[in-house]
Amino acid sequence: MQSMLCGRPVAADRQLIMAIVNRTPDSFYDRGATFSDEAARAAAHRAVAEGADVIDVGGVKAGPGQGVDVDTEIARLVPFIEWLRSAYTDLLISVDTWRAEVARLACTAGADLINDSWGGADPAMHEVAAELGAGLVCSHTGGALPRTRPFRVSYGTTTRGVVDDVIRQVTAAAERAVAAGVTRDSVLVDPTHDFGKNTFHGLLLLRHVDELVKTGWPVLMSLSNKDFVGETLGVGLTERLEGTLAATALAAAAGVRMFRVHEVVATRRVLEMVASIQGTRPPTRTVRGLA
């Protein structure tokens, strides 16, 4: 069963996987493994072969690091997106940027979805998405500026303050996007773990993820190998898969629509198992006790 998202066909009866392809030499997880054109193309081919529904292409490391100006970000993203669109004409392509100028050129090159992971830091982003007919991810950063780390972040005196703030901010941003002309069914919301949040905030958001789902806006979650997973389990960057997948299973069971991931195959298996437990997906084969 298929539906349309940002003008592209996607599965309607299961969660979607957004595979990460970083065009950066210093990304927090892969440390530049897909920075070269050849490596990035190979990663995209692999992700599609493994069942990714969306490819998310970023040109600037999320955290602090070497400065990247607009022209450099454009050079990293636009030619690759042009190639990706020519290679996969029906694939949903996402661009991860907080700069409206970059988003404009990326969408002109073939991107369908703007993953504005720094929560509207550029106020022109809604207008660009509307003008170009692109989808938009409305993210929550608690007011943090792009490429900064959280420091003594507070969301009030109640334990669920961050939950209320996330729901209030992302739903308001989604409504502003629609008012600007972005198609309602092309808007997603993202609580944006680790951005303007500490580990306790990340865990609370997962504990109450059903409340975000109940807003009616499709929810995107980027949990993959995040610091809140590492701090919760006391493990390093290369040992966060199990924690990521546990968080993914919980969020999937609550109804999260899309997951932004590094590991496509492992995530797909988790999502399929959750769906089978919930009764929305039949087992692949049933022999035990029947033959």
UniProtKB/Swiss-Prot annotation:
It comes from the Bacteria. GO terms for biological process: folic acid-containing compound biosynthetic process. One of its GO terms (cellular component) is cytosol. InterPro entries: DHP_synth-like, DHP_synth_dom, Dihydropteroate_synth-like_sf, Pterin-binding_dom. PROSITE patterns: DHPS_1, DHPS_2, PTERIN_BINDING. Residues 15-272 form the Pterin-binding domain. The record marks H193 as: Characteristic for family members without dihydropteroate synthase activity. One of its GO terms (molecular function) is dihydropteroate synthase activity. Has very low affinity for the DHPS substrate 6-hydroxymethyl-7,8-dihydropterin-pyrophosphate, but can bind the inhibitor dapsone. Seems to lack dihydropteroate synthase activity, and does probably not function in folate metabolism. Homodimer. Belongs to the DHPS family. This is Inactive dihydropteroate synthase 2. It comes from Mycobacterium leprae (strain TN).
